Amino acid sequence: MEPILAPNPNRFVIFPIQYYDIWNMYKKAEASFWTVEEVDISKDINDWNKLTPDEKYFIKHVLAFFAASDGIVNENLAERFCTEVQITEARCFYGFQMAIENIHSEMYSLLIDTYVKDSNEKNYLFNAIETMPCVKKKADWAQKWIHDSAGYGERLIAFAAVEGIFFSGSFASIFWLKKRGLMPGLTFSNELISRDEGLHCDFACLMFKHLLHPPSEETVRSIITDAVSIEQEFLTAALPVKLIGMNCEMMKTYIEFVADRLISELGFKKIYNVTNPFDFMENISLEGKTNFFEKRVGEYQKMGVMSQEDNHFSLDVDF
């Protein structure tokens, strides 16, 4: 049995820390806590009213996917990961991740509630998993992995793919709006959320490195390429980014670029060997290994949380 999954009678007490790298990730998550009340969306309505019908359609569907997906991630954490993983440091991270995912879901729901005035349309968007085939396909894939009989390692990769690949193209599409100077509330919340998801993805990679018997490279590649195909179809066929003026082929390449970055972080060879086609995505938090403590998004960090004097903690650890 994997040591991180083995019964641990000390799991109810945090100290003494046994896994400093995992604990450090938890402290990073704690330092980046935020709430929806801190995001000003009052100026978005003027921009929203100026968008074309295609642009509105695209944003509404992306928000509908996001609003549902965080709940799926949380269900996996509650039903599987939090009960399987026996080391306290990881349980701290997963517990905090659940709180953050709730904030993300609330943020997306609030954005839908603010932009969409028709109550029937709101209900349609809030129930996207049932009402939208393109969203249902992604949700079904993620939910399948919650209940899969595969080992923790495989399911860890699947949910790294959900947070690292299924979200990537949609994040990029919203950053595209930022590049155009539109929707400041939506784009700022997107910065915060994409940074959080980058950290969650980094954490999955860290947990993977703690496995003594990880899934094979072939298995990892299969899961990741499957997720890439679904995400590419989502943003180039079902909900094409050309609706907001983006290039569909470049979006396909970007999703492959993100997948390569993920599989490299897991310690395997790249699959696609492509470069990032979107210059405006070079510095966002899905880059992994983010430096958001030195220069946090919106100059925003809980004061003092990371000011550790204990020599065991290092911000230079190569995750």
Curated annotation (Swiss-Prot):
Source taxonomy? Viruses, Varidnaviria, Bamfordvirae, Nucleocytoviricota, Pokkesviricetes
* A Pfam family recorded for this sequence: Ribonuc_red_sm
Supply the name of the protein: Ribonucleoside-diphosphate reductase small chain
Q: Outcome of residue 300 to F?
A: Partial loss of viral DNA synthesis
Protein residues bound to Fe cation 2 = 101, 163, 197, 200
Origin superkingdom: Viruses
GO molecular function per UniProt: metal ion binding; ribonucleoside-diphosphate reductase activity, thioredoxin disulfide as acceptor
Catalyses which reaction?
a 2'-deoxyribonucleoside 5'-diphosphate + [thioredoxin]-disulfide + H2O = a ribonucleoside 5'-diphosphate + [thioredoxin]-dithiol
Instruction: Show the active-site residues.
Output: 108
